[in-house]
Amino acid sequence: MLSKMEINKRALKENMALLACPICGAAFEFREPQSFVCLEGHGFDIAKPGYVHLLKQAHKTKYDQALFESRKKVIASGFFEKLIERVTEIIAEKKKEQLVLYDAGCGEGSHLARVVSNLQATGVNVKAVGLDIAKEGVKQAARDYPGTSWTVADLANCPNQAETADVILNILSPSNYVEFKRLLKKDGFLLKVVPEANYLRELREFIYVDEKSSYSNESVTSRLAEKLSVEHVERVTYKAPIAKELFADFLEMTPLGWHIEADKKNELLENLPEELTVDLQIIIANRAHLL
């Protein structure tokens, strides 16, 4: 039986042609036992439990192991399941028998793993690459979801070859549209998920008493429309139950919870809502105007 390291190493080798040196952009070759070396001699080793660190230099982030453990618990509870089901349906509607799928801002990998599993269940052959600048998230993804190519990467300098992606997922994560345009195939598309006005309304109304109690994604969507051709927009809205024992994890994983004073957080934990509003916008965009 193969170890997680061996499974992930095999996946990275199989997807090597999709990757590019973050320093010079050259293609890689694999050198045993576990190194990617580009044509210019820049080398990157596969780290345990099976991910590759493809940054020019290390980056410090706010995202630590505790946050990603909390994120995994919340996602595993089914909180985002209706969103992921719809994301899968949209990709499956393209009727591709095989596709290359990048998750830009993959975190600890749960969303990508679920989408890949759903697509594979319909008979689609998926080559998947997860990218995130937070090493702790990527490390956890490699541990929990072996078989996908997990990379520590900067979305402003994606270590991937041009025109290789059929689909780029970008779920509640920052974007770099210049890089996304470079990575998309001519018939590929970006599937971006952003909050809508009522996302986590119950938390916002408790934490804020001013205009921050509501949210606008106008600046995000306007910027996207400037860079790519928007093909389709839809809204996914539902109420999701949240178990009391998961609420502390929820506050750990969402930026809304990072700025609550201790007294306010304790008050919230003593008066928990039974459900939270999930209100998200799915945007499908392509590079049609560039052709």
Residues covered by each model-derived region:
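Class I SAM-dependent methyltransferase Rossmann-like catalytic core
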Residues: 9, 60-86, 90
